[in-house]
Design a protein with these regions (language model features):
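Glycoside hydrolase catalytic-domain context in secreted enzymes
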Residues: 1-201
């Protein structure tokens, strides 16, 4: 887990920090600082959320200098409108439509590790195409409580099936050079009481 605060006296630029949206890949969950690249050769890491494939902003615009323009962000399930002053003459429009894959428990019902591995490979290739380094998935929690609002993300109530599914999709993603997963929600994410004041990360 990367946490921290940018110090202006230590670095010469202020890139996105974990928890903010990425300015490098619109709609990505966040990115780490690229400030160490000039001195140490350490690239920043761009992370995109799951769980049904990559979750990125499908449409975005930049000005002619390449600066991201506001609009297109998902707000309340709908994309925010672009300012009508953005025309083809003063802005460029980009599209990054990602494949929507079935959710975890649907994939687990296939009983096919080969299928899950091929789905992982598809996700890894899309990560490469859109410049994403880490996929914030798969979700490996088990179905402990039928009232859990996030059971759809998890593979099964059976830990063996869940582990086999997560391993297969991980193999697929990581078969693509430089791409990785962040298996998450090992425990306590199924708690519905006091949900907004607990931390399962």
């Amino acid at each position: 887990l990367c946490v921290g605060m940018h110090r202006t006296n230590q670095f010469t630029e202020c890139d996105g920090m974990l928890g903010n949206n990425s300015n490098l890949v619109p709609g990505a969950a966040g990115d780490t600082s690229g400030s160490l690249y000039p001195r140490r050769g350490i690239k920043n890491i761009i992370m995109a959320d799951g769980p049904a494939g990559l979750r990125l902003q499908p449409v975005f615009k930049t000005d002619k200098q390449g600066n991201l323009l506001p609009g297109g962000e998902m707000i309340g399930g709908y994309p925010a409108a672009f300012n009508s002053s953005y025309t083809n003459e003063n802005s460029d429009t980009y599209y990054q439509y990602c494949t929507s894959i079935p959710i975890g428990w649907s994939l687990a019902q296939s009983w096919s590790p080969e299928l899950l591995e091929s789905v992982g490979t598809l996700i890894g290739r899309e990560m490469a195409a859109f410049g994403v380094d880490l996929w914030l998935a798969p979700a490996l929690n088990i179905h402990r409580n039928p009232l859990c609002g996030r059971n759809f993300e998890y593979y099964s109530e059976d830990p063996l099936i869940s582990g086999k599914c997560a391993a297969a999709i991980t193999r697929g993603v990581q078969s693509c050079s430089g791409k990785g997963v962040t298996i998450k929600h090992f425990a306590a994410n199924s708690q519905e009481d006091n949900r907004y004041f607990s931390n399962s990360h």
